A protein has these predicted regions:
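Active-site phosphate/pyrophosphate-binding segments
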Residues: 525, 529-655
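N-terminal export/assembly segments and adjacent metallocofactor-ligating motifs
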Residues: 241-509, 680, 969-1012
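Glycine/threonine-rich phosphate-binding loop and adjacent beta-strand/alpha-helix elements that clamp
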Residues: 428, 732-756, 766-767, 771
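Surface/interface-facing alpha-helical segments and adjacent flexible terminal/loop regions used
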Residues: 1-245
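Phosphate/diphosphate-binding loops
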Residues: 272, 471, 697, 703-707, ...
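Extended redox/cofactor-interaction regions of prokaryotic respiratory oxidoreductases
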Residues: 389-457, 463-465, 469-470, 495, ...
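Long, well-ordered, tryptophan-enriched scaffold segments
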Residues: 464, 468, 473-576
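Long, contiguous, secondary-structure-rich segments that constitute the structural scaffold
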Residues: 763-814, 899-901, 905-915, 920-1012
């Protein structure tokens, strides 16, 4: 092949033109606009515009934009730079995603499409210059890549390297066709709609035209070069000669650098599920050259003594969640009203200087106890952000701490009043020994509650165990495993338990010997000295004080469970021994949620199902067989603690909090309310807290809490209330390790898979820098400079107690260590085997059915000494039902772990956010399946799709908790965020969240109201 001189000159002009345009596009799309960058293009705008056909309707926008730039002053350039950042580089969702993979792949970053682009760069020894700018399939970088190729093509042409020139043109055509042309149209359409200035609007027209035109011209050029006689060549003649200054003034790579690094082979990196679901599943990331192509799960041999630790739907969705283009990307500080969501991007140095300054200022002005680390479990691990923040503040003089949790406040707090400990559960491998399992408000098929919980329930069912589910909702667990479903009205669980106990006692089905030997306060003859026998549990059942016997007929009216069903349930539980009554966390997240917790323990004691294989002591049900050590928080110099659910009270009126009314511990009063709040990777700042509207009102008052710092990976509803917002990392971008909740027989390594994108940093990394500014870095790190260092140190400490653990590197390589147990762990087996040597860890040494400690509180109406049914506020017997006739509960949806994954589009396709409503209630409101409805009470309004189904009992609606609060202009939530309607009122003893106790009404949304 020989290129004629005339052709060569013409082609060279063509290459110059293309090089100029691609550099113009690369700069316009990738670099923040400055006068220095655009001066050349402003002066030569006629050459840029001459490339567009005169009929192109984007010409006037681009021309006007460049003309305007010629008149810009400093403030106008600043405004244009902000517009560029808003469009393409905002720290969070952007109007116009600039990355190819978002359009052509799974709407995520760092996938196979990103890898394909990187492979193209590698062929030409190029790589991204600054990884903090994000993935290299940015359209601006792809235009820069085309500019580099044209420059090299010109060099080949000038040196008569015709073969190299042709190969280069082929590569350009391929890259245009395979990559840029595939998404430029969609990108440009979004740019035209989103742009607020003529320049970027015109760029949206120009780019789309240019890519189509250039692809056609390259195709014609290749036909000319290859002398394709089968087609008519229409390679365009160049009508003007471009000056040499086009190249001389502009010869650097834009966003790219030379790199001799070659492509990398795919590898599988072991990590694990880090959701706070109680599970800890094996996740294997298949990664190549910094791009995660897929995830798989445990593939080791499956055995009964060591089953596989398989991932659920949430873990399989990690890529779609954590590689989202909506990630927070850079540190930001608030510039609008708190909660408005308006931020400006700042550097890490500025962010950490500000944080250190506020930490010092607030301590000096209000004392160390005015600083608070909010309850936050956006992820679990040995190195966990909330605990790290506590460690940092403990070393800096202290902080106001909390106790309890949002998950299990009542059960963790109340169970020890009966047993002296919350560790009352048998491990799940014991389920197979049960003849009957009652899952009371327990739905592990969706909540997970330990990765293999449903595996062991399935094994029990296969061995003949009868499974009964007690729940207002026919859950996924009930559908998959239950032999029987017993729906019960929310907040009435104790009435059902009381009637069961009444039946068991009056029909002489109870284990009197067990009660006589191990229990305190069941009947008058086993009461503490000096306490009237009418205070016993038996006296309560028989109505000796209140005149009401707790019969099945009495309970049927309250609970909605037929009398005969109550009797049969009681008989089954008493006679099908060993039986396990396993409580979930839903029933205890109600008004008086402490009562069903202790009610379940009484039933277990009455039937002698405590401390035996196949039984269950009920209550909290925690186990402590194995676990991973965590980075210690250290000793807090300030002794005060509040219940975690009452932090809003501590912000609004902390000085008025007391021990009796608010559960304040460690101190008699607080000198100040919360003035500084650290919210590290969690949504209890707003979305997961009760009464969102009231919480927003408290947070918006900057005279109360003066500074809020949040670390997160998305612009969540909670993150919008930050004064300083820091971009965190995901499971793929850091080292950690963890175990499931205490029932787990394994620990998992969580190895870093890819580098953190953009300017994202693990909390530990930036907290070290804050510690440096506070003068406590050495004490904070203890010589551990990374999360990996901490994991290694903690693992080596674990090896001292567990010498069977393999070498640390082997553990990291395999990703998991499993203990193989031949026998289950049975809570209180030692007490039952030898009570004299092993009393229960209560003050009396017995199971305290009657609690002297609760009796001493002298609050029998709300905190009785024996568990009993108490009419709940906003319960079925509340007069408020005249106004709001429906009870509303929440549940943990299979698609989310609390609020994590709500922004996962694939999950939304599989599990739409919708409330469940019984056909009777729907018909009364003219609602049919699929309608949108408004749910409302005095606290707020939300709109949501309706699933009409008999799987929820009449009089009750159920809303999946965790949806992200998304208000419209009137403040009406459009996403179905349940906490718009829940209350800040806490339970009387534990001061726990009663977020499942709500009265509401529902109305169908008519078309004119904006419904779908």
């Amino acid at each position: 092949m020989t290129i004629l001189l005339q052709q060569k000159t013409e082609i060279l002009q063509f290459m110059k033109e293309r090089n100029f345009i691609y550099r113009f596009l690369a700069k316009s799309l990738f670099l923040p606009p400055t006068q220095e960058i655009f001066k050349f293009y402003i002066e030569n705008r006629h050459l840029v515009l001459s490339i567009l056909p005169e009929t192109d309707n984007g010409l006037k926008f681009l021309e006007q934009g460049l003309l305007d730039m010629a008149q810009y002053r400093a403030e106008k350039w600043q405004a244009l730079e902000k517009e560029h950042e808003r469009l393409f580089f905002n720290s969070g969702p952007v109007p116009v995603y600039p990355w190819e993979s978002v359009y052509t792949g799974e709407h995520i970053l760092y996938d196979a499409h990103t890898l394909a682009v990187k492979s193209e760069y590698r062929k030409w020894q190029l790589d991204i210059e600054d990884p903090t700018q994000g993935p290299l399939d940015h359209i601006g970088l792809e235009c820069s890549f085309m500019a580099v190729l044209t420059e090299r093509a010109m060099k080949d042409l000038a040196e008569d390297k015709e073969d190299g020139f042709v190969e280069n043109i082929k590569a350009q055509q391929h890259f245009l066709q395979a990559h840029i042309a595939g998404f430029a149209g969609l990108f440009c359409e979004k740019l035209r709609k989103a742009a607020a200035c003529d320049f970027y609007r015109g760029l949206g027209f120009f780019l789309e035209f240019w890519i189509k035109s250039d692809l056609q011209n390259l195709t014609e050029l290749l036909a000319l070069l290859l002398k394709d006689k089968s087609r008519e060549i229409k390679f365009p003649l160049r009508k003007q000669v471009l000056p040499e200054s086009f190249l001389a003034a502009d010869t650097f790579y834009i966003g790219l650098k030379h790199s001799a690094e070659t492509g990398k082979q795919m590898k599988i990196v072991p990590t694990a599920g880090r959701n706070n679901c109680g599970g800890c599943c094996v996740v294997k990331a298949h990664v190549q050259d910094g791009n995660i192509l897929k995830v798989t799960t445990d593939s080791e041999p499956d055995a009964p003594e060591s089953p596989q630790v398989r991932a659920c739907v949430r873990a399989y969705g990690y890529r779609r969640t954590f590689l989202s283009p909506d990630r927070l990307k850079y540190p930001m500080k608030r510039v609008g009203e708190r909660g408005e969501g308006k931020f400006v991007r700042i550097s890490w140095d500025e962010a950490l200087d500000l944080l250190a300054l506020e930490t010092k200022r607030i301590k000096k002005c209000y004392g160390a106890a005015s600083r608070y680390v909010n309850y936050a479990w956006g992820y679990s691990g040995a190195v966990q952000a909330m605990r790290l923040a506590k460690r940092l503040l403990a070393l800096d003089g202290g902080y106001l701490d909390f106790y309890n949790s949002y998950s299990s406040a009542c059960t963790s707090y109340a169970t020890p009043y009966t047993y002296g400990t919350k560790f009352t559960g048998n491990t799940p491998d014991d389920y197979v020994h049960s003849k009957l399992i009652i899952l009371w408000g327990h739905n592990p098929a969706e909540t997970i509650f330990g990765t293999n919980t449903t595996y062991y329930l399935k094994k029990a069912k296969e061995s003949g165990t009868k499974i009964i589910v007690v729940d207002p909702r026919y859950s996924m667990t009930a559908a998959a495993l239950a032999d029987e479903w017993i729906p019960v009205r929310p907040t009435t669980d104790n009435a059902l338990m009381d009637a069961m106990a009444y039946t068991i006692f009056t029909e002489n089905l109870h284990d009197q010997k067990f009660l006589d030997t191990f229990c305190l306060g069941f009947d008058a003859s086993h009461m503490p000295v000096g306490i009237d026998g009418k205070e016993s549990y038996c006296a309560y059942l028989l109505g000796e004080k209140d005149g009401i016997a707790k019969t099945p007929a009495w309970a049927a009216k309250i609970t909605g469970v037929p009398e005969i069903k109550i009797q049969q349930l009681a008989r089954d539980y008493a006679l099908m021994k060993p039986a396990a009554l396993i409580q979930g966390y839903g029933p205890q997240r109600h008004a008086y949620g402490e009562q069903p917790v202790r009610g379940g323990t009484v039933l277990a004691a009455m039937t002698g199902n405590v401390g035996i294989a196949g039984g269950c002591a009920s209550g909290a049900g925690a186990t402590d067989r194995h676990g991973v050590l965590s980075v210690p928080t250290g000793e807090n110099p300030f002794p005060g603690r509040i219940p975690c659910y009452l932090w809003t009270e501590a912000v609004a009126a902390g000085e008025k909090m007391s021990a009796t009314e608010h559960g304040l511990e460690g101190v008699t009063n607080l000198d100040s309310g919360i003035k500084m709040l650290w919210n590290m990777s969690g949504q209890c700042l707003l979305n997961q807290h009760g009464d969102i509207n009231k919480t927003m009102e408290i947070l918006k008052d900057t005279t109360k809490c003066e500074f809020i710092v949040c670390s997160d990976i998305f612009m969540t509803p909670s993150a919008k209330f930050a004064d300083l917002l820091l971009p965190g990392t995901t499971v793929f971008e850091e080292d950690n390790m963890r175990s499931p909740w205490g029932s787990g027989d394994y620990i998992c390594s969580m190895s870093q898979v890819i580098e953190p994108p953009f300017a994202c940093r693990p909390e530990y990394e930036w907290m070290k820098d804050v510690a440096e500014r506070l003068g406590i870095r050495e004490a904070f790190t203890e010589g551990h400079e990374s999360m990996a260092d901490w994991c290694a140190a903690l693992y080596h400490k674990m090896q001292q107690a567990h010498p069977e653990l393999p070498a640390y590197e082997k553990f990291r390589q395999r990703g998991i260590f499993k203990w193989a147990h031949t026998e289950p762990q049975i809570a209180f087996a030692a007490q039952i085997a030898d009570f004299a040597k092993n009393p229960f860890p209560t003050p009396s040494g017995k199971i305290e059915i009657f609690s002297p400690r609760l009796y001493a509180l002298n609050k029998p109406e709300e905190i009785p000494a024996v568990p009993k049914y108490i009419r709940a506020w906003e319960g079925p017997e509340d007069a408020l039902r005249e106004k709001y006739p429906l009870q509303m509960i929440g549940w943990h949806y299979a698609r989310r772990c609390h609020s994590v994954h709500d922004n996962n589009e694939a999950m939304e396709e599989a599990f739409r956010q919708e409330m469940w409503m019984n056909p009777q209630d729907a018909a009364a409101r003219n609602i049919v399946n699929g309608d949108r409805a408004e749910v409302f009470n005095d606290r707020g309004k939300m709109q949501i799709f309706v699933k009409v189904t008999p799987r929820i009992m009449p009089g009750v609606i159920s809303v999946p908790q965790g949806a992200w609060f998304s208000p419209d202009g009137k403040g009406i939530d459009q996403r179905g965020s349940i906490n718009v309607l829940t209350s800040l009122k806490a339970t009387p003893l534990a001061k726990g969240n009663a977020q499942h106790t709500n009265l509401v009404d529902v109305k169908k949304i008519q078309c004119e109201e904006g419904g779908a």
